[in-house]
Each structure stands twice: as C-alpha cells, then as structure tokens.
Amino acid sequence: KAYAFNVKREGYLFYSDNFSLIDNKIDSSLIVNIPLQPIETGASIILKNIFFDVNKFQLKQESLTELDKVVLMLNENPAIRIQISGHTDNVGKDADNTALSLNRAKAVMGYLLSKNIDPKRISSKGFGATMPVASNESESGKALNRRTELAVTSD
C-alpha cells in the first residue's frame, strides 16, 4: 500500500514524500531524514506527491492534498513568490517533453490560481529532460527525473 506524508515548520518550506510498504515487513521501522529549508529566495523542493498519467498533464486526484499544502504555505507567507517547474525523463522527442513539462507546471499553477493565489506570485516553466537529477538508464532514475519542483523566487 502507498502512503504519503508531509512535515511543516513555521518559516520553512514544507517537506513531503511517499513510500510503499509492499517490500517492507510489518515489524520493520522506516526512518526518514527530513531536510527542511528556510523560506528564502533560491530555496526549492520537489513536490513528491504530484501525480500525472503517462504523457498527460491533467492533475490526478491524489495530487490535491499536496497542492493544498502549497496553497496554505503561500497564504501563510504572503510576501513570497514561487516558480513551478516541470521536468520529464528522456523518453520521447525533446520538443514533446518540453511541452509536456510546461503543461504540467501550468496545471499546477492553474490549481493554485483556482484557490485565489495572486497570479503575480506564481510563474511556471517546463524544462523537459534537460535537468535530470538521476540517470535515465534505469526505471527508478527515470521516475526521479519525472518531477514537479517549487522554487522561491525574488520577482
């Protein structure tokens, strides 16, 4: 079964993650090091509980809890501005990946705007497969590269 969790502390970007207990025994412990970052220009997080179907940019229902955490953070910190960045793995054409990543970032931005966040506070950008965080040689690496990031910006 899949689980998600969020950690929040005043003055810091929230942290979220997801995990499965399929490969773990019931009696084993799960220990997680949680790196919280101060809310300041340049700080960024991967929104690990944002989900899309393959080659689609419509947000899956499971993403809304995470997005509501972003809305709460923005409401609690009215002076910050953010950029939402979409990223893909390297499967497919570069132009298609760039368009998909931009459309996914815009979908996230659209949800935030629907929750009355000032559009001047949010921007979106699609990077396609140009900024991998892992090797695209394995399925697990590709999964890490398919991500949505939130970065605090100065303008």
Where are these regions (language model features)?
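A short, solvent-exposed beta-strand micro-motif common in secreted/extracellular proteins
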Residues: K1-G11
